[in-house]
């Protein structure tokens, strides 16, 4: 009966402790991890009674974190109202008694913290320049888009204007249209907001398109100058045979492919750079810096192009078309003699058309030189005096550089419509048809028919359309394209 004594002692202890502890002891004896967690949670916290002064050592995950201190750019504004992140702001020193506003927590993704700067509103000192740039850009954009579209549509839809000469002018208008439509909004948006649309892609594509447009203009002027020289020195009759569509496309392909091949280094030269500023946050800018990931041979070629870019730009895209045009005009004047003298094989209307075409080439060259001269001057100044100029001056020179290209694309079609009589007459007829479509009558229709017949007579006798009125029997019949 000795084994009954330990059992009796155990029962007495259990009765003295209580039934709640019995259930806890039974669960603990089963060895469950869940019982241990519940027992730890049911225990009173350490220091609740005897360790009251150690309460400041408690770790609360929701407390305000002072370090690392977030960056507060001056131009940024929080997207949400100021809310205290600490559960007890009075302990953190951000009480209402101090009179200071609560600081916001700027931790998060950059897209949530950064905002696009809008200098247009509220109106400040920089708003006037932003409005001036936008107004100038809108005028250039509207004039250039309407003018270039008009030239392309007139050449495309008119049977009497489909020639190699007018096709070159239409391709010139197409490239100017692309530059104005795609590059102008990106440049103006970057100038106003200091943020770059499409990022690194636009930094490479915009210079490529602008240089390609300059190349198309350069080679087009050279081709037109060669054509004038060929006409002046040719012994063929004044009326030339029809030029097939394949020949026209081949000439345009040479101009386009050559221009884009010369502009390929621009894709490897430019890249996007982001600079933090104390007033405007992060500012996007495009810099000439080849990527270090390029192969060694290609990297050396791009660096060589960067070092020689200024003089290559000046020689190929400025001096070449001007020298070509001046030389061809001097040779043409030398062959034809003084203006009062008329060659035996050319007289009357044909001589007038020849002088008109020469005036067109000279006018295009003068406009091109006038628009590209500021760009070349800015390139030379930046290349030799960039270390002595401020950042604002460099930005202004870059803006002038861009706008000179946009001015060229907007003025060129206006000049073509004013100098070239067939293009200008077709544009006026199109405008009159659009404006007076509902008020037409018998007299108006007869006037329109007479105007059309007059235009056809003028154009068919000019060099713009190579098909003669009475073609030789050996020439194939059909349209030029």
UniProtKB/Swiss-Prot annotation:
PROSITE patterns membership: G_PROTEIN_RECEP_F1_2
One GO cellular component term noted in the UniProt record for this chain: receptor complex
Origin: domain of life: Eukaryota
CDD domains with a match to the protein in the record: 7tmA_ETBR-LP2
Tissue: Highly expressed in brain.
Region described as Disordered: 30-55, 76-107
Residues with PTM Phosphoserine: 471
Entry-listed glycosylation sites: 105
Cellular compartment(s): Cell membrane; Cell projection, Cilium membrane
PANTHER family linked: G-PROTEIN COUPLED RECEPTOR 37-LIKE 1 (PTHR46216:SF4), PROSAPOSIN RECEPTOR GPR37 FAMILY MEMBER (PTHR46216)
Protein name, as recorded: G-protein coupled receptor 37-like 1
Lineage: Eukaryota, Metazoa, Chordata, Craniata, Vertebrata
Gene designation: Gpr37l1
